[in-house]
Amino acid sequence: MIARSWRGAVKTADADAYAAYIDETGMQHYASTPGNRGAWMLTREVDGGLTEFITFSLWDSYDAVRAFAGDDYTVARFYPEDDRYLVERDLSCHHWDVVRSTSG
């Protein structure tokens, strides 16, 4: 199993709208991609009036990650309205091989 994460930040005033946007885009895309085992959106307020977003997803294999992200799966995937919200963004994603889990 593969874990994938990405990080970005928006103005806290835009956090609810951006969360709704991620629900409609990235989270739906995760859920509809074969091999996805779940996705989570994490948030926290940070200094400077920003809210940080982390998307975290689990995948059956790197082939499943490629089906979502493309051949260069390390590059973050963005959607048309992301520029409207994001004031910080990681351009790449982190990936880990899951070697132990307490869940099924």
Where are these regions (language model features)?
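Short amphipathic alpha-helical segments
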Residues: T12-G38, V75-D82
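Intrinsically disordered, low-complexity segments
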Residues: M1-A3, A13, D90, V99
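Glycine-rich beta-strand-turn "strand-cap" elements at beta-sheet edges
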Residues: W40-T51, R77-G104
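Intrinsically disordered, low-complexity acidic/polar segments
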Residues: A15-A17, A64-R66, T102
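Non-catalytic surface loops within mature trypsin-like serine protease
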Residues: T12, D60-S61, D97-R100
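Alpha-helix boundary recognition
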Residues: D23, A31, R66-A69, V87
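Residue-level detection of beta-strand scaffold positions
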Residues: M27, F53-T55, L91
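Short, well-ordered beta-strand segments in beta-rich or mixed alpha/beta enzyme
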Residues: I2-A9, G38-D71
